[in-house]
Swiss-Prot record:
ATP binds at residues 167, 169-171. It comes from Prochlorococcus marinus subsp. pastoris (strain CCMP1986 / NIES-2087 / MED4). It comes from the Bacteria. Residues 84-122 are annotated as: Domain II. The gene is dnaA. This is Chromosomal replication initiator protein DnaA. GO terms for biological process: DNA replication initiation; regulation of DNA replication. It is found in: Cytoplasm. Pfam families: Bac_DnaA (PF00308), Bac_DnaA_C (PF08299), DnaA_N (PF11638). Oligomerizes as a right-handed, spiral filament on DNA at oriC.
Length: 463
């Protein structure tokens, strides 16, 4: 498969001018040229989901652009990289998408949550837009599905059910759909509510004989975004009314997006018919972000705040807060506030005691590991991360890789990057060799322990 092609490059340039930036970045840019023979343009996409979406929504657009460039009829076909790699054992064919996108703003029209566009005020968080969402392996599927329903509501995934733990970005994605929808269609009626609000509105309407107004509020919308649906648990009458609301919107072709901390089948005391309705579209889960995604989130937040954070500080914060994004961003905010109030520099040494009192004296960064190892074995840091195969250097490098794996939260590929761009398999081999020697070679065991003592990484939480 060719990495690039002049014709496809020109077609992409033309499409970039004619499509919105989110659409181009999400669907067109990831497509790679495969071949162009006898008027047949074959493109490779990251996965089945992208292939299907391009085929249904962009085939004609791409063909017209290609015909304009080539001067003759062109037919486009899409092949999934997933299928090419024979990766058919994946549990979900839409679980991998290379998506980068942007979006904008929104307005809604009724009561506190459904407001007229001209009022400029609304209940959706202005920060919760697609361009501020950092996509990682943990959230690619959910992000792609959210963008898909934002672009074409009521078609592919209805309802879209986003599930995941607290603080992982469910509400962000849900509200981003609302922002995007009204940016595309200013007259769209978008309603975002929590399940508790839905239940409270229902109770109030019953007490005040206002069911007509209640039904009008919830069933006249084009897009219903309902958060924390797990709170329907055990509320029989609320479930009954939500079932009716769901059916009314679905039958009218309106889009429904639901968020929950668990899949529909795991919500206790939820009616089977609701479980069935919630499962008839797409269930997309969001997992906790890995270290690389957490670092990307912090970097993006720093850029938004126009701050320049040292890489080792970003690594430190990302390594200490791994459970959810909310805690991660809270730690960033505290670090910035602390530095501002005290006048101390934004460094690991100054920020660590505030974020993690137990980390005083045991903060380990990749640079520190490399320095301690190079000093201990009396080789230069440059030589340690080089490709030198001299035995003293290669042995020191293997121990350095082992200690970096033990003392930091970096993945194998990232450790390889720290050691001059080594492949992750090289890092894995080095770690395995050191682990074997620890039990068979007292000299190596002593060397490793001495450097550990210098770094004080035995007391770190991940050991």
């Amino acid at each position: 498969m060719q990495a690039a092609n002049p014709i496809w490059a020109e077609v992409q340039q033309l499409l970039q001018k004619n499509l919105s930036k989110p659409s181009f970045e999400t669907w067109i840019r990831p497509a790679k040229f495969n071949c162009f023979e006898n008027g047949l343009l074959t493109l490779i996409t990251p996965n089945n989901f992208t292939s299907d979406w391009l085929r249904k929504n962009y085939s004609e657009t791409i063909e017209k652009a290609a015909e304009e460039i080539c001067g003759h009829n062109v037919k486009v076909v899409f092949k999934s990289e997933t299928n090419i790699n024979n990766n058919s054992n994946s549990s979900d064919s839409v679980s991998q998408q290379n998506i980068n996108s942007q979006s904008k703003s929104f307005s809604i029209n009724q009561s506190n949550n459904l407001i007229n566009r001209s009022k400029k005020s609304h209940s959706l968080n202005t920060r919760y837009v697609f361009k501020r969402f950092v996509v990682g392996p943990n959230s690619r599927m959910a992000h792609a599905a959210a963008l898909a329903v934002a672009e074409s509501p009521g078609r592919e995934f209805n309802p879209l059910f986003i599930c995941g733990g607290v603080g992982l970005g469910k509400t962000h994605l849900m509200q981003a759909v609302g922002h995007y929808r009204v940016e595309i269609d200013p007259d769209a009626k978008v309603l975002y509510v929590s399940t508790e609000t839905f239940s409270s509105d229902l109770i109030q309407s019953i007490r005040k004989d206002g069911m007509h107004a209640f039904k009008n509020k919830y069933r006249s919308v084009d897009l219903l975004l309902i958060d924390d649906i797990q709170f329907l648990e055990g509320k029989e009458y609320t479930q009954e009314e939500f079932f009716n609301t769901f059916n009314a919107l679905y039958e009218a072709g309106k889009q429904i997006v639901i968020a929950s901390d668990r899949p529909p089948s795991q919500i206790p005391k939820l009616q089977e018919r609701l479980i069935s309705r919630f499962s008839m579209g797409l269930i997309a889960d969001i997992q906790p972000p890995d270290i690389e995604t957490r670092m990307a989130i912090l970097q993006k937040k720093a850029e938004q705040e126009r701050m320049n954070l040292p890489r080792d500080l970003i690594q430190f914060i990302a390594g200490r807060f791994s459970s959810n994004i909310r805690e991660l961003e809270g730690a960033f905010t505290r670090a910035v506030a602390f530095a501002s109030i005290t006048g101390l520099p934004m460094t690991v040494q100054s920020i660590a005691p505030m974020l993690d009192p137990n980390s005083v004296g045991v903060v380990v960064t990749p640079k520190q590991v490399i320095k301690k190892v190079s000093d201990f074995f009396e080789v230069s840091a440059e030589e340690l991360v080089s490709s030198s195969r001299r035995k003293p250097v290669s042995q020191a490098r293997q121990i350095g890789m082992y200690l970096m794996r033990q003392g930091t939260d970096l993945s194998l590929p990232k450790i390889g990057d720290e050691f001059g761009g080594k492949d992750h398999t090289t890092v894995m081999y080095a770690i395995e060799q050191v682990e074997k020697k620890l039990s068979s070679d007292p000299n190596v065991a002593s060397q490793v322990q001495k450097i550990k003592d210098l770094l004080q990484i035995d007391s770190r939480k991940n050991l």
